[in-house]
């Protein structure tokens, strides 16, 4: 029985139709596999051909569009167009490809040229290139620009900036050929340099400068608060005040206080516009002058309705140096006249006062200092012992944690006595120049800033002692600000200043600190 079934299966397997069907299935599968392989090979061939075409494509040259030279259509309906371009420094007229629409090409725009010098495409207008400052805008839309060296040239507007407002002193980017303005750069605003605030410092917060405060009150406060009397006596208020003297003695505080007092007297919030001279210096021609103009424009905007505005220029000697000295790159030859022009215009602004501060009045241009400009000059000197006592008491008060049994007056007096000693323990250096010798003591360089720093040092020592030992009183470690800690603070200040003198040029150090070599002996 089993043998018969085996025989039937063998006979079926040898059936020609079944064998043919099986072979057809196998051939069909092979055919599908070959078709897929052929498709993949064809796709890879297309990719390789595309890459090869890309690699073999000729380079395209970038140029700058000037204008469409000609565009017409012949009797067969074929368009013929050409354009004027700038290729480097050469002007050329080249044909346009039929795929390029002439109406979409604007002056200053980038175009692409093939090997046959045919415009085949357009590209984005570049936004990088040489930077220039606008000196003048002509009636026909052209611009006169200048570079860093002051060299001037005439340029046209690219179509991208044809309707963009461009003013004098704006900074623009031009194309490499120097023909078109491609873009306008954002301006550095004077507000970025100005510290605009309403001061809360009054004259009562300033110690040791009674004479200087009285003079600036007479020069500034009286004209603002008694205008009718000044008009009656045909007396004009000063345009400006110069505070000069060694650093750290309250020049900025005085300027803030006068702004506060003027505001209190007028009933309006006064504005204190503060800027440091070096911040206005800029290597680009005309930029410093533009910033000066913008500062005075801002003062004019803020003034009005009796609102007093103080324009305070610190380190004025760095901005308004004497012209022709050769000390710098002579940028002051244009900055000083611009400042004087703005200062002369202050007379039309009843509520604006210019106050300058400088450590080196000898470096400021004489035209700035003459009567009618910075009329009032106030020398802010170093404090003597009486003034030092008044200043110290502003920072060392009875409200602070003090040594038991001592009050602020006693500690301040001890500080001043130690600081003004003229013995070896407070001798900073002995300077010798051409046979002239002078001993420099701490008393010679004392300033309001130094006094505050000494008090802050003593406070820091007291805080560290509290942290280290806790709030529990110890007989060997008195709590609070003690006389011993004040003397330690003076010693620290002494060591710091002595090392500073030894590491700097003595002559320059003397000039900065407003000192001279008096003949103390040879």
Swiss-Prot record:
Coiled-coil residue spans: 20-57
Single GO biological process annotation from the record: modification-dependent protein catabolic process
Any single GO CC term annotated in Swiss-Prot or TrEMBL for this entry: proteasome complex
Chain residue ranges for the region called Disordered: 1-26
Amino-acid positions noted as binding ATP in the UniProt annotation, renumbered to this chain: 248-253
Top-rank lineage group of the source organism: Bacteria
ATP-binding as UniProt keyword: yes
Alphabetized PROSITE patterns for the sequence: AAA
Record's keyword annotation contains Transport: no
Keyword terms: ATP-binding, Coiled coil, Nucleotide-binding
Single annotated GO MF: ATP binding
Family, as annotated: Belongs to the AAA ATPase family.
Subunit note: Homohexamer. Assembles into a hexameric ring structure.
PANTHER family: AAA-FAMILY ATPASE (PTHR23077), PROTEASOME-ASSOCIATED ATPASE (PTHR23077:SF144)
Name of the molecule in the record: AAA ATPase forming ring-shaped complexes
Species of the source: Bifidobacterium animalis subsp. lactis (strain AD011)
Name of the encoding gene: arc
């Amino acid at each position: 029985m089993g043998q018969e079934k085996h025989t039937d299966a063998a006979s079926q397997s040898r059936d020609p139709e079944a064998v043919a069907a099986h072979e057809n299935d196998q051939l069909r599968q092979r055919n599908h596999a070959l078709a897929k392989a052929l498709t993949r090979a064809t796709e890879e061939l297309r990719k390789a051909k595309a890459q090869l075409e890309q690699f073999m494509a000729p380079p395209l040259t970038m140029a700058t569009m000037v204008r469409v030279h000609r565009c017409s259509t012949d009797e067969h309906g074929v368009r013929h167009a050409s354009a004027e371009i700038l290729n480097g420094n050469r002007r050329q007229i080249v044909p346009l490809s039929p795929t390029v629409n002439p109406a979409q090409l604007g002056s200053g725009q980038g175009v692409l040229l093939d090997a046959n010098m045919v415009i085949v495409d357009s590209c984005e207008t570049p936004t990088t290139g040489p930077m220039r400052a606008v000196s003048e805008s002509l009636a026909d839309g052209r611009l006169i620009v200048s570079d860093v060296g002051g060299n001037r040239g005439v340029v046209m507007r690219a179509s991208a900036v044809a309707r963009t407002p461009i003013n004098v002193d704006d900074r623009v980017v031009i194309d490499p050929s120097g023909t078109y303005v491609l873009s306008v750069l954002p301006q550095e605003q004077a507000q970025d340099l100005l510290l605009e605030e309403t001061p809360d410092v009054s004259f009562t917060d300033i110690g040791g400068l009674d004479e200087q405060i009285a003079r600036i009150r007479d020069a500034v406060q009286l004209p603002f608060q008694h205008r009718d009397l000044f008009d009656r006596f045909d007396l004009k208020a000063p345009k400006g005040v110069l505070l000069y003297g060694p650093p750290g003695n309250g020049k900025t505080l005085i300027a803030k206080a006068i702004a506060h007092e003027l505001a209190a007297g007028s009933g309006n919030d006064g504005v204190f516009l503060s800027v440091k001279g070096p911040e206005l210096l800029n290597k680009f021609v005309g930029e410093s002058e533009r910033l000066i103009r913008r500062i005075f424009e801002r003062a004019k905007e803020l003034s009005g309705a009796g609102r007093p505005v103080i324009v305070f220029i610190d380190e004025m000697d760095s901005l308004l140096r004497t012209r022709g000295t050769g000390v710098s790159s002579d940028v002051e030859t244009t900055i000083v006249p611009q400042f004087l022009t703005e200062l002369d215009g202050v007379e039309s602004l009843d509520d604006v006062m210019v106050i300058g501060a400088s450590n080196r009045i000898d470096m400021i241009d004489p035209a700035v200092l003459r009567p009618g400009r910075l009329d009032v000059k106030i020398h802010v000197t170093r404090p003597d012992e009486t003034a030092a006592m008044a200043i110290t008491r502003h920072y060392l008060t009875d409200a602070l944690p003090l040594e038991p049994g001592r009050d602020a007056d006693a500690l301040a007096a001890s500080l001043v006595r130690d600081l003004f000693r003229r013995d070896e323990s407070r001798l900073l250096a002995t300077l010798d120049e051409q046979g002239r010798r002078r001993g420099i003591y701490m008393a010679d360089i004392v300033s309001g800033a130094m006094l505050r720093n000494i008090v802050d040092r003593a406070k820091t020592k007291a805080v560290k002692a509290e942290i280290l030992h806790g709030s529990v009183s110890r007989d060997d470690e008195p709590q609070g600000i003690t006389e011993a800690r004040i003397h330690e603070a003076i010693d620290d200040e002494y060591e710091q200043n002595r090392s500073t003198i030894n590491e700097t040029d003595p002559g320059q150090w003397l000039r900065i600190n407003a000192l001279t070599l008096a003949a103390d002996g040879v």
